[in-house]
């Protein structure tokens, strides 16, 4: 069916056939909003994307209203099993979303973030310290994967012996679960990984209730607001989705962000002369990389978009975030990587409004700590070079690298 849509030149078919979301987004610049023959709307317009993301009239949980949408969005069935995608805060709207966000907020306070910052700094130092001078490494395997993995496992209190298995579940859920449409085999893999992950976290949660520790599960198990608490299902779904979203997207921010730096050597030289630019690097990398390439929302009522497009209740819109983050109406010379871009933080890489990613600050500090440590220990950036061909990961929703061999030069 998707092949037919592609043959017809339908924007949804073109989306599914595209391997480059930035190039695809450029084909959408002819107007703010395009409509597929399936009824699905598609946009790469920054203003439309931002307005949809912040509006309470749009729901995060999609609806399959016809055979075309069912093929693309997937069928949604209620189950006794815990679904990390449909039961976490990311899929909640309105009062339900506000309630859960209020309850999990104690897990993301300034004090907690400061502790996480110290952990990220310590882990980044340990990882960079393991790299030998004048050696070649796979940046993904040596740095981009281990840092967020260690951080999330530490935050959740996952024992060292279980971390590889734990992460494999998260990667399966992120790579397959965030891409649609899926094959029958992919759905089976997804269900297996989801069951194993949620069962494992349920076991950890039961342990934390018996013996609380200084970790996220213990905090979530004991939060209370006006007599309200989180259910076990909500805690398990929240922790599961933190792994899915917090691990894979951060890996890709780190790896693809470093790839972008290597492709923009003038910017790399600037940052080695002024490490105060590292926070700017994080924001511009988020804008250019857009780890989550696109997302979708479903209208909760009949409404009108910023460009005047009329939308019926239940209609779905695909928001091409990779395109919104390069909208020339917002960002001057949007395809250029500029460390000193003044409005880089306007990006929508972490969403916008009520559904702005609650773990955004964690991803930012992980990236900042790793890049700072690399610049300190390997200051000769002239020696930073590709040592082989980067291998890009298949999949459209999440942009990332499977491997990236690099040479970092002499170690200080």
Give residue ranges: language-model regions.
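Cytochrome P450
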Residues: 1-412
């Amino acid at each position: 069916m998707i092949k037919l849509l592609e043959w017809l030149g339908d924007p949804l078919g073109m989306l599914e056939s595209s391997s480059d979301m930035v190039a695809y987004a450029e084909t959408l610049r002819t107007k703010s909003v395009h409509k597929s023959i399936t009824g699905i709307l598609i946009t790469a317009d920054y203003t439309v994307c931002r307005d949809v993301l912040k509006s309470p009239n749009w729901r995060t949980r999609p609806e399959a209203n016809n055979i075309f949408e069912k093929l693309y969005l997937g069928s949604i069935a209620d189950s006794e099993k815990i679904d990390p995608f449909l039961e976490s805060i990311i899929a909640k709207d309105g009062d339900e979303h506000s309630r859960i966000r209020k309850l999990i907020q104690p897990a993301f306070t300034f004090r907690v973030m400061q502790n996480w910052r110290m952990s990220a700094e310590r882990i980044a130092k340990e990882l960079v310290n393991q790299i030998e001078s004048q050696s070649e490494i796979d940046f993904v395997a040596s740095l981009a994967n281990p840092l967020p993995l260690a951080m999330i496992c530490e935050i959740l209190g996952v024992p060292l012996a279980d971390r590889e298995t734990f992460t494999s579940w998260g990667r399966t859920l992120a790579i397959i679960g965030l891409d649609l449409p899926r094959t029958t085999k992919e759905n089976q893999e997804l269900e297996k990984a989801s069951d194993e992950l949620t069962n494992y976290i349920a076991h950890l949660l039961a342990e934390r209730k018996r013996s609380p520790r200084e970790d996220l599960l213990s905090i979530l198990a004991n939060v209370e607001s006006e007599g309200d608490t989180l259910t076990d299902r909500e805690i398990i779904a929240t922790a599961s989705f933190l792994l899915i979203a917090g691990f894979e997207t951060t890996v890709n921010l780190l790896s693809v962000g470093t790839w972008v730096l290597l492709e923009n050597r003038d910017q790399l030289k600037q940052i080695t002369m002024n490490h105060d630019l590292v926070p700017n690097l994080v924001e511009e990398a988020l804008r250019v990389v857009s780890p989550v390439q696109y997302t979708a929302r479903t209208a909760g009522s009949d409404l009108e978009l910023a460009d005047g497009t009329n939308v019926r209740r239940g209609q779905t819109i695909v928001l091409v975030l990779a395109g919104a983050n390069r909208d020339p109406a917002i960002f001057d010379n949007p395809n250029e990587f500029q460390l000193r871009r003044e409005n880089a933080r306007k990006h929508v890489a972490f969403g916008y409004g009520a559904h702005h990613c609650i773990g955004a600050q964690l991803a930012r500090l992980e990236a900042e700590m790793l890049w700072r440590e690399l610049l300190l220990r390997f200051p000769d950036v002239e020696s930073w070079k590709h040592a082989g061909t980067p291998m890009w990961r298949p999949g459209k929703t999440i942009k990332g690298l499977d491997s990236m061999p690099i040479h970092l030069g002499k170690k200080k």
